[in-house]
Amino acid sequence: MPVKEKAALLVPSGTYHEPDKKHLHIICSDPDAKGLVVIVGISTYTNDLCDQTCVLQAHEHPWLRHQSFVLYRKAEIVSAAALQARIQSGEVLECDEVNAQTFLRIKKGLCKSPQTKRKVKRYLGC
């Protein structure tokens, strides 16, 4: 699967206690002329201190097991080629795309969230 908007990936994000843990990440843009894309992670919703911009329910993606939220503060602009290389090496795993409605909520949240970095907002034209 090519690196493109709506693609969902499982990216290594383990902790000391769970080094093999992976979190769901969503690619939020197609590659631009420089081959860059915006990617954002999904994390477990633990309390009201979590970013409220886009809260997801377990039924919104097969990988989600419980209520989660989009971790806009860690949204990044990354090289699509580097991401593709990580997929080909098996470090990053591909999974089912996000449905169109959920993706639209995630993408709109990049501009709405007060936690999205300024450089990501500028890149997206927010």
List PLM regions with ranges.
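Mixed-charge, Lys/Arg-rich low-complexity intrinsically disordered regions
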Residues: 1-3
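Loop/turn positions that initiate beta-strands
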Residues: 5-8
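Generic structural signal for residues positioned in beta-strands
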Residues: 10, 38, 55, 69-71, ...
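Compact nucleic-acid interaction/catalytic patches
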Residues: 12, 17-63
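C-terminal terminal-subdomain/extension
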Residues: 60-126
